[in-house]
């Protein structure tokens, strides 16, 4: 009985460790390089220069982008008219850089808080 109990315990620890590693979050990217790629590869044409959306057909990407896995899935296999950015076109490292850039974009100020609107 102790053998099974010990084996079960070890198996549970290994599974939990693997699950925790899988949920570590997005890969680390270079936000400055991500901004360069975002602007150079045409993302801004539809999604706006700071990911705000509202230009053309692209939805907002920042602040608060999708979780990385969902974001990567949309970029690689878009469910809409966006062209797919396969790993041949955009490497995994470049995709992580773009995501890091989107995470680094601060929220836009609330337009209702602008003093000029009070006049």
What are these regions (language model features)?
Residues 45:
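Short, cysteine/histidine-rich loop/knuckle motifs that typically chelate Zn2+
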Residues 23-32, 36, 40-41, 49, ...:
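Flexible coil segments in periplasmic/lumen-exposed cytochrome c-class electron-transfer proteins
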Residues 1-28, 113-119:
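N-terminal export/targeting leaders of redox proteins
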Residues 16, 53, 62, 76, ...:
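Hydrophobic alpha-helical segments
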Residues 31-37, 48-84, 88:
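Gly/Gly-Pro-rich "capping" loops immediately C-terminal to redox-active cysteine motifs
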């Amino acid at each position: 009985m102790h053998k099974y109990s010990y084996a079960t315990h070890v198996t549970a620890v290994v599974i939990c460790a693997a699950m925790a590693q899988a949920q570590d979050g997005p890969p680390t990217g270079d936000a400055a390089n991500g901004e360069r790629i975002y602007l150079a590869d045409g993302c801004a044409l539809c999604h706006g220069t700071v990911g705000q959306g509202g230009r053309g057909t692209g939805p907002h990407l920042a602040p608060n982008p999708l979780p990385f896995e969902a974001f990567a899935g949309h970029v690689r296999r878009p469910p809409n008219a966006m062209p797919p950015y396969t790993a041949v076109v955009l490497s995994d490292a470049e995709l992580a850089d773009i995501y890091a850039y989107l995470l680094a974009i601060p929220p836009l100020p609330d337009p209702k808080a602008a003093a000029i609107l009070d006049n």
